[in-house]
Design a protein with these regions (language model features):
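Short glycine-/small-residue motifs
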Residues: 125-128
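Conserved active-site tyrosine of GNAT-family acetyltransferases
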Residues: 18-23, 94, 123
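Vicinal oxygen chelate
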Residues: 1-7, 29-85, 89-119, 130-132
Length: 132
């Protein structure tokens, strides 16, 4: 048995707004779009977005656990790392867009990468990195 790759699924509060962000700001194409879900691709990278907009937890009664898996408080709790070639060039493209994470400018890391991170409209963290 050998694992081959992973596809991140990021929880978002507004699927339309988030799909537009990944398409318009980061250059992804929309491969699949249906209610509450989007599959996005750019080159060999695929990211899935799923809408976490269930507000039912706010008004529920009793002590039953919250179990829909799409509760609104989950939106923005995700993140992923994307390996790229030409991270410095990509940083120059992304920097003027105003989407960089405040504490994740382009840097050399102790674990041997050059990387930076952006945040989507829900504050999911997407880190772009290149091995040195």
């Amino acid at each position: 048995m050998k694992m081959l790759f992973a596809i991140p699924g990021l929880p978002v509060s507004d699927i339309e707004k988030s799909t537009a962000f990944y398409r318009d700001k980061l250059g992804f194409t929309v491969a699949v779009r249906k209610e509450g879900f989007a599959k996005l691709r750019r080159d060999a990278v695929e990211i899935h977005l799923w809408e976490a907009a269930d507000e039912g937890w706010r008004t529920r009664v009793g002590s039953e656990p919250i179990v829909s898996g799409a509760e609104s408080f989950i939106a923005g709790t995700g993140g992923c790392r994307v390996s790229v070639e030409g991270v410095e060039e990509w940083y120059r493209v992304v920097q003027p867009l105003g989407i960089l994470h405040d504490n994740a400018q382009l840097e050399v890391t102790p674990w041997g990468t050059r990387e930076f991170a952006v945040v989507d409209p829900d504050n999911n963290l997407v880190t772009f990195f290149e091995r040195k």
